[in-house]
């Protein structure tokens, strides 16, 4: 996280870009073995034959084309070719363009081709020694279930600002934006489909909803705060829990949020502005 935050501090991207970067980084790392296997097969080159910057660009491209539904294929290819031109040379850009377009063609001709790679150990994105241990301890069936569990996309959740619309109206509005959700708890919705569209909704941009995991908010629920309470959060950045507290104490309450890391405080300030909180 500290490396990502250093990049955020240097370039100061908006919330949409920051969130998108974090999703890509986390997912590519989680499925790194699988993505690298597919790159090797499609490009016809071993990892040592491709420079590290070009590997990173291909990983992003393969992730967006094969796994993510947030960006059209043509936009992925175009943006990554332009990125390659800006950091390398025309030869490298031509290589990236050729490999990504080959992947798109291969996928369009037979979307199921990738399933034939599932028998490779790299597909599981786990070190071989861990796979051997799991097979020994869990058996074949237990091993398969464990791998599927580790590699499945983690659920995404939306926190609702309790001072805004009723939950039924929020679910309806999200559905109209192509986002399928269901009630998870009093303050949270589980996203079943269309998570990539959440950051572009009007409700997100004006602070009516936020992306937050219920696990990270559990400590807030344990406090059992009431309307009008005054709460001091001394390890607050980037502010998701503080904003949750703010919605619970209401305009008659107050949250004093602080953190020792200046760059994280700045991130929190931007999110406070998005929510329009004055308390």
What name fits each language-model region?
Residues 1-279:
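S-adenosylmethionine
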């Amino acid at each position: 996280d500290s490396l990502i935050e250093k990049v955020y501090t240097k370039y100061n991207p908006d919330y949409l870009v920051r969130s998108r970067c974090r999703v890509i980084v986390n997912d590519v790392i989680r499925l790194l073995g699988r993505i690298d296997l597919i790159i090797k097969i499609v490009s016809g080159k071993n990892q040592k034959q491709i420079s590290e910057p070009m590997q990173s660009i291909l990983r992003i491209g393969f992730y967006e084309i094969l796994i993510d539904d947030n960006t059209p294929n043509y936009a992925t290819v175009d943006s990554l070719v332009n990125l390659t031109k800006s950091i390398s040379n025309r030869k490298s850009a031509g290589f990236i363009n050729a490999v990504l377009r080959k992947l798109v063609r291969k996928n369009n001709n037979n979307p199921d081709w990738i399933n034939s790679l599932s028998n490779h150990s790299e597909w599981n994105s786990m070190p071989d020694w861990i796979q051997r241990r799991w097979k020994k301890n869990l058996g074949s069936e237990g091993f398969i279930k464990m791998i599927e569990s580790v590699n499945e996309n983690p659920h995404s959740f939306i926190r609702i600002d309790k001072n805004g619309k009723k939950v039924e109206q929020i679910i309806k509005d999200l559905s109209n934006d192509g986002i399928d959700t269901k009630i998870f708890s009093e303050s949270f919705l589980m996203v079943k489909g269309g998570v990539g569209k959440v950051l572009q909704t009007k409700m997100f941009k004006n602070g009516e909803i936020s992306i937050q995991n219920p696990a990270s908010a559990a400590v807030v629920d344990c406090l059992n705060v009431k309307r009008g309470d005054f709460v001091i959060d001394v390890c607050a950045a980037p502010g998701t829990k503080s904003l949750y507290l703010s919605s619970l104490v209401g305009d008659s309450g107050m949250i004093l949020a602080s953190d020792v890391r200046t760059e994280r405080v700045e991130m929190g300030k931007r999110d406070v502005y998005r929510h329009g909180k004055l308390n």
